Structure formats: structure tokens, C-alpha cells
UniProtKB/Swiss-Prot annotation:
Belongs to the RFT1 family. One of its GO terms (cellular component) is endoplasmic reticulum membrane. GO terms for biological process: dolichol-linked oligosaccharide biosynthetic process; glycolipid translocation; protein N-linked glycosylation. Residues 1-11 have a biased composition (Basic and acidic residues). The keyword Endoplasmic reticulum applies. It is found in: Endoplasmic reticulum membrane. This is Man(5)GlcNAc(2)-PP-dolichol translocation protein RFT1. It comes from Yarrowia lipolytica (strain CLIB 122 / E 150). The lineage of its organism: Eukaryota, Fungi, Dikarya, Ascomycota, Saccharomycotina. Its main location: endoplasmic reticulum. Intramembrane glycolipid transporter that operates in the biosynthetic pathway of dolichol-linked oligosaccharides, the glycan precursors employed in protein asparagine (N)-glycosylation. The sequential addition of sugars to dolichol pyrophosphate produces dolichol-linked oligosaccharides containing fourteen sugars, including two GlcNAcs, nine mannoses and three glucoses. Once assembled, the oligosaccharide is transferred from the lipid to nascent proteins by oligosaccharyltransferases. It is a multi-pass membrane protein.
Length: 673
């Protein structure tokens, strides 16, 4: 065995960088306080240096793996050796910021990306309206359903489960394992997230193969090619999933923003280019279905490449691996080595996947099956009950109508899920419960304002605006009964937006704190709601001949049921934690706002404010400003408190949690004595 170089004891925090080669010891442990008398003794204790002698290797396999813990003292800052490589912590740069402020900043960044995304989609739709038909939009909607199904079944459950696996309170990387990383350290937790990300990759291969075999979804030429291209795009997208989940764990929203911003623009250019090439072939329908497939493939290639590059750049100095790697459990006994260093001897076997997280992901996956049937159930019903024309009408209304929902509400939902997952652990403190209640009440109350605007002005204003956007080709979107036209469906969709927004906010709380048993109960409830949704949708679309409008009303019924279930769950959650519950009066607007809003809604129902010209639009804008003024006057104090809450500079939650943990530790020590 080669002689190991000696090390002068610099300080208690210095890391040895010269013991063995990089191949021999992936991560060098901290240097000891006192120089040992025997170099071979260091090699035996390390467990990370590869022995050249076969007899020694045989002997080493009988030794348990070991983790070194250097003595730690508070308020000691060690100077860095100028020859020592600089180590950057994989802990996200936002750890020192308050959790609420970080979540709000991330949500703001995602809102910016959604604005860019929807502006690009808006421009693309406007260009496609010049060359595409409602039937082409209907065919592309079915391709989008295939893509969303593969991605949802492959990654949604894993993503939601991994949001519980945060870096808060994890041990620093002074714990070193010769064969990899250690459980409950920063690097060990990051490695667990990366390992779980590869489950999505494997699931994506399976579901993509199943979807590719089901290419006879609609009787259009090139349908088989289009479906197979979409499935390839899904697998390419999922190839970067380990990098995505790591970026979200580290709260690196900029990586996601960069990936989506570039990919969205490329997708729009590719989709429109292929649509132009196919416009002269059978009205553009047969060749046009390939445009969406090629556009999505370009999106997946760009987004995956950007994710991989940015996440690797952010984690250049790391102790974990981007490939699946074993994690050493931290279930052990303390021993004292000959050189007075604390050594943890591990008898448990290393693992790749965290079992509680896997079980949670399994429970969530069952629940997401029902959730997907409800979320995408409208596409299933519209493809079963309605022709391609009505499918196209619903698709274009969904693209335009969901602009506000996806620009504003979806990023808020993502931010709330991240916030609640980090704030409310297994044993949340009283301060954490109070803060979560304040944030939830504020969001729900704001959404009631949105509901007033949507119900008061949406049905009267949006049909005219949408008809204007359709332009000269608007006639082909108004065939048949007026109630089945695209503008009429858009007016109904305005009523659906606040239900969708409120449900997203409440379910983000449920998904952040629910146990596997809670998720199973939710899955059963969603199964019942899906039956109700399908029954009501079929009745309204087919029996009452409402077309796509019937589907919108069925969605409102569905969202109402889901909101009711979430409200009951949240009530019992706070009761079970013996915390002050949500006061219903805190969720309702003031009397002045309610009076103004009800007056506006009644006027809309009786035809007052019906828009047929831009002059009428101006009148409605004036009424909307009056409602906004009433909100500002009535809710000025609540709005100021919300702004102060978001801009809070000190994370009192972390301080209180630390104090409670110290009290529990003192209590347990007293009981042991």
C-alpha cells in the first residue's frame, strides 16, 4: 500500500484533500484534530481508500462502513487553506431568507414565465387562426391529452412526494461515507431526491410505450406518426426529471424559468412553421397534426438541455452524484476511535430509495389517477360526445380562457405548495400553524374578489372580446346554434375560472400536509366526483344539447365538490393539531364589497352591461373600477397586513421552531436523567 502523506493539524474544520486519489476516496473526510501515530490506522478507519493488496481488500470487506464526525464547536470560524479547494454548499442560496419571502419570490418568477408563455401561446393561436380550422384544433387537443397523460402518470406523484423531502434542518456535509453520501445530510437528501427522479424516467418509458401503441385515436392521416412523436417528446422531457426535482428542492426557480422561457419560444416557432407547410394539404388538417408533435419535441429537447446545464452549473462543487447512488443510513452507534475521533459504525445496508417517500408517492399516484381523470376528463368527454368541430371550439376557448388562470393562479398554487410543504412538517409549531392560516385566509379572500369580477363582467364582456380576436375567420367558429359558438362558450368559461383558482389553492394545502391515509380517502372521493362529473357532462352536452358549454358547467359542479372536500379536510387538520381554526368571516369580503359585487352580478344577469361595441367595454371597465375602489376602501387594512407579511425580513417561524426543539431536547434529557 502506498504511504499516505502526513497532515499537519490546521484546525478542526479543515478538510484533507491529499489522502489517496480521487478514484480511491470520492469525498475526503475532515482532517483529525491530532495527527495519528500510524498512517495505516487512518486508512483502516477511513473506509474509503482502496487497498492494493488482495488480502487487505478481503479483510476490509468484513469491516462495517464508517462515517466520521469531526468535533463541532459553536462560534468558531476556521481560516481556509489557500491550497484547499473551495467547497460550495449545495444548500440553496435562499436558505437565509424567510421561507414566505422565498416562496413569494419564486411564485413571482413563475408568474413572469407564465406571462411569457401565455403571450407566446396567444401570439401562436392568433397566427394559427389564420391558417387552421376548428377540426385541426380538436385533433391537436387530443394529442395534447396523450402528452399530458404520459407526463402526469410518470412524474406528478413523484414530484408531490418529493416536496416533503426538504433541506430544512439537515445535517451539514461534515458527515462522510467512504462509498457515497449519508442519510439526513444535505448531500444525502439531495441524492435521495435525484434517485427518486429516475423513477419518473422509468415510468415515462412504460407509459410512452403504451400510448405509442394506441395511435388510432382519431381518423386523421399521420395520426400514428404524430402520437409516436409526442411519446418521444415525453421521454425526452422526463430525461431531465432528476435535475428538475433537485432544482425545486433547492428552490432554484431561475433554472426552471430559463428552461421554460427558451423552450416555449422555440415551440411556438416550430409549431407555426410546420402548420404553414401543411396548410395546403387537405385544408391543413392531415399534415397540421404533425405541427404540434414537432413543436412539443422541440420544446422537450430545449427544456431538458437547459435544465441539465443550469442545474449542473449550480452544483459544480457537490458531494452527491447526478446518477443513482447509494445512501448510507444514519442508524448507528457511537464509538471512540484510537485517535480520539468520534466514529459512527453502520450496520444497516445502504439504499437507493427512501422507503417512506416511495410509499407516499405510491399513495399519491393512486390519487392522481382520479385527479387526472377529473382534470383531463373534459377532454375525454368532449372526444366521446362531441365531433371534432366542438372539440376545436372547446380547445381554443380553453387556450384563451385559461390565460389568467395559468399566468396568475397556477404559479400561486405552486408557490403555496412549496410554502406549506416547508412550513408544516410532521409536528408544526403553533407559530407555523398561525402563519399558514393567515396565508390561506388571505389567498382565499383575494380569490373571492376574483370571483366577483369574473361573475360580474366575464359573461357579458368576454364573448365580444373573443369574437374580436377571432377576426375575419370568426364565422367558422360560430357554426350551428349560437349557444355552441366559441364566444358563447367563452362567456360560460368566465364563471369557471374562480372555481378552478380556489380549488387549486385549497388542494395545494391538502397535498402538502396529507398523510398516505388522507390521500387514499381523497382518491375515493375523487372517484365519486369523477362519476358525478361524467354523468352531469353527458347529460348537459348530449341530452340538453349545450355542446361545449355543457362541459364547462359540468366542470363547475366538479370543482365545487372538490372544494367542499378540501374545506372539510382543512377544518379537521387544524382541529387535530389543536390550533385556532379558520374563521369563515375572515374569508368573506366586507359588506361594501359584497353589496357592490351582488349589484354588478344582478345587472349582468338581466342584460345590463351586455357588450356589443367597444363603447360598452368602456362602460364595463368603469363599473369594474368602481368595484375595485370598493375593495380598496373596505380591505385596505387587510391588504397592508398581507404586504407586510410577504416582505417580512425575519423568519420567526424558524426561530420558534428552534426554541421548541431545544425545549423538547431539554425535556427528553431531563426524563432520561
Amino acid at each position: 500500500m502506498d504511504e499516505l502523506p502526513s497532515h499537519e493539524p490546521k484546525n478542526r474544520y479543515s478538510r484533507s484533500s491529499s489522502i489517496g486519489s480521487p478514484a480511491d476516496a470520492r469525498y475526503a473526510p475532515p482532517s483529525p484534530l491530532h495527527e495519528p501515530s500510524d498512517a495505516s490506522q487512518i486508512a483502516i478507519a477511513m473506509g474509503g481508500v482502496r487497498q492494493r493488496s488482495a488480502s487487505i481488500r478481503k479483510h476490509r470487506r468484513q469491516q462495517p462502513s464508517q462515517v466520521f464526525i469531526p468535533p463541532m464547536h459553536e462560534n468558531v470560524t476556521a481560516p481556509r487553506d489557500e491550497h484547499e479547494p473551495k467547497m460550495s454548499s449545495p444548500v440553496p442560496e435562499t436558505d437565509e431568507k424567510p421561507l414566505l419571502q422565498t416562496s413569494a419570490a419564486g411564485a413571482t418568477l413563475l408568474i413572469g414565465i407564465q406571462i411569457l408563455s401565455k403571450l407566446a401561446s396567444f401570439g401562436l393561436n392568433q397566427m394559427l387562426l389564420l391558417v387552421a380550422t376548428p377540426a385541426l384544433f380538436g385533433a391537436n387537443a387530443q394529442l395534447e391529452f396523450v402528452l399530458n397523460t404520459v407526463l402526469f402518470f410518470s412524474r406528478e406523484a413523484v414530484r408531490l412526494a418529493l416536496q416533503r423531502l426538504t433541506l430544512a434542518g439537515k445535517k451539514p456535509d461534515v458527515y462522510v461515507f467512504g462509498g457515497g453520501v449519508v442519510q439526513d445530510t444535505v448531500s444525502g437528501t439531495s441524492q435521495a431526491v435525484i434517485n427518486m427522479g429516475y423513477i419518473s424516467v422509468l415510468l415515462g418509458v412504460f407509459f410512452s410505450s403504451v400510448a405509442a401503441a394506441s395511435h388510432s385515436l382519431f381518423s386523421v392521416a399521420y395520426a400514428s406518426w404524430a402520437v409516436q412523436l409526442v411519446c418521444i417528446a415525453a421521454m425526452v422531457d422526463l430525461a431531465s426529471e432528476p435535475y428538475y426535482v433537485l432544482a425545486m428542492q433547492q428552490l432554484r426557480f431561475r433554472s426552471r424559468a430559463a428552461a421554460e422561457a427558451v423552450a416555449i419560444l422555440v415551440r411556438c416557432v416550430v409549431t407555426f412553421s410546420f402548420t404553414l407547410l401543411a396548410k395546403d394539404t387537405d385544408g391543413g388538417l392531415n399534415g397540421g397534426v404533425l405541427a404540434f408533435a414537432f413543436g412539443q419535441l422541440a420544446y422537450s429537447l430545449i427544456s431538458s438541455a437547459v435544465y441539465i446545464y443550469t442545474v449542473r452549473q449550480d452544483n459544480r462543487d457537490r458531494q452527491f452524484s447526478f446518477r443513482p447512488q447509494k445512501i448510507q443510513p444514519f442508524e448507528s452507534q457511537m464509538e471512540m476511535s484510537d485517535n480520539n475521533r468520534d466514529v459512527i459504525t453502520h450496520n444497516a445496508s445502504p439504499y437507493y430509495l427512501d422507503k417512506p417517500t416511495v410509499r407516499l408517492a405510491g399513495s399519491i399516484w393512486i390519487q392522481t389517477v382520479f385527479k387526472h381523470c377529473l382534470t383531463e376528463g373534459d377532454r375525454i368527454l368532449v372526444s366521446y360526445f362531441l365531433p371534432l368541430y366542438d372539440q376545436g371550439v372547446y380547445a381554443i376557448v380553453l387556450n384563451y380562457g385559461s390565460l389568467v388562470a395559468r399566468i396568475v393562479f397556477f404559479p400561486i398554487e405552486e408557490g403555496l405548495r412549496t410554502f406549506f410543504s416547508n412550513l408544516l412538517g410532521e409536528k408544526p409549531s403553533e407559530t407555523a400553524l398561525k402563519l399558514s392560516r393567515q396565508v390561506l385566509c388571505s389567498v382565499v379572500r383575494i380569490y373571492t374578489y376574483v370571483a366577483l369580477f369574473a361573475a360580474g363582467f366575464g359573461p357579458t364582456t368576454l364573448p365580444f372580446i373573443f369574437g374580436t380576436l377571432l377576426g375575419a375567420r370568426g364565422g367558422q367558429w360560430s357554426e350551428g346554434a349560437p349557444s355552441r359558438s366559441a364566444p358563447a362558450v367563452m362567456g360560460a368559461f368566465a364563471l369557471y375560472i374562480p372555481f378552478m383558482a380556489l380549488n387549486g389553492a385549497l388542494e395545494s394545502f391538502v397535498q402538502s400536509v396529507a398523510t398516505p391515509a388522507d390521500l387514499r380517502r381523497q382518491a375515493v372521493a375523487l372517484g365519486v366526483f369523477s362519476v358525478v362529473f361524467a354523468t352531469v357532462g353527458g347529460l348537459l352536452m348530449k341530452t340538453m344539447d349545450l355542446g361545449a358549454r355543457g362541459l364547462v358547467f359540468a366542470n363547475i359542479v366538479n370543482m365545487t365538490l372538490r372544494i367542499g372536500w378540501s374545506v372539510v379536510f382543512i377544518y379537521h387538520y387544524y382541529v387535530s393539531h389543536k390550533a385556532e381554526n379558520v374563521n369563515p368571516t375572515h374569508l368573506l369580503p366586507g359588506k361594501l364589497v359584497i353589496a357592490t359585487g351582488v349589484t354588478t352580478i344582478l345587472a349582468s344577469l338581466f342584460g345590463v352591461g351586455r357588450v356589443s361595441s367597444f363603447r360598452d367595454v368602456g362602460i364595463n371597465i368603469g363599473l369594474a373600477l368602481a368595484l375595485a375602489a370598493a375593495i380598496a376602501v373596505e380591505e385596505r387594512q387587510a391588504l397592508v397586513q398581507l404586504v407586510q407579511l410577504v416582505r417580512k425580513k425575519e423568519d420567526k417561524v424558524k426561530v420558534d421552531d428552534k426554541e421548541e426543539k431545544e425545549k423538547e431536547s431539554d425535556k427528553s434529557e431531563g426524563e432520561s436523567e
